[in-house]
Amino acid sequence: MVKIILASESPIKENTLKQWFKENKKCSVSIKKISIEDNLLPPQPLNTGGSLTCSDRLKNTLNKCDNLLKYDYVISIENSIIIDDSKLIDVVDIKIKDVLIDKEYSATGGRIDVTHKLLNDYGKLPLIIEELQESYEKTNRNYIYDGCDKTFGEIVNKYYPNIQSNNWMRTLCGVDRKSQIMNVLDELSSKISV
């Protein structure tokens, strides 16, 4: 059994890790979830803020845990929004610390484009993007990395209450958060030994 510390209390992230290890490494996992609350890290990382926030959550988890050698891996998973000229791009950053050999690995991927093509089905998208921009302008100085206090999913859920705030991409873009994370874990597969 692989023992993991997850720098999150997200059930989606926990279940994704369990499924990925079962399917790809043919093993079961035991996961200890740790909530990392840091007022300097933005709830919604933007641009490079996702990778940096992911790194900080990993570092904070390592500092917070006693007896790390009881575990095989410490994992941090963070979604962020990259702002491009004509679209928003949701990506996943994953950082893994192999406790036994004291090495860290990272990958970014799972790209999901939020473009003007969604306007036909989601006419309130400009309002969502405007509110994200306003949140950024009001709160980005509160954080050490690029980001804001309202997540894109929370804003989507405000305008479309039937869309889950933690898995908005499944409804808007047809890609489930779980499969998005699994794709990035696949990139790290060769680094993870059991």
Task: Annotate the PLM regions.
Residues 42-194:
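Anionic-ligand binding patches
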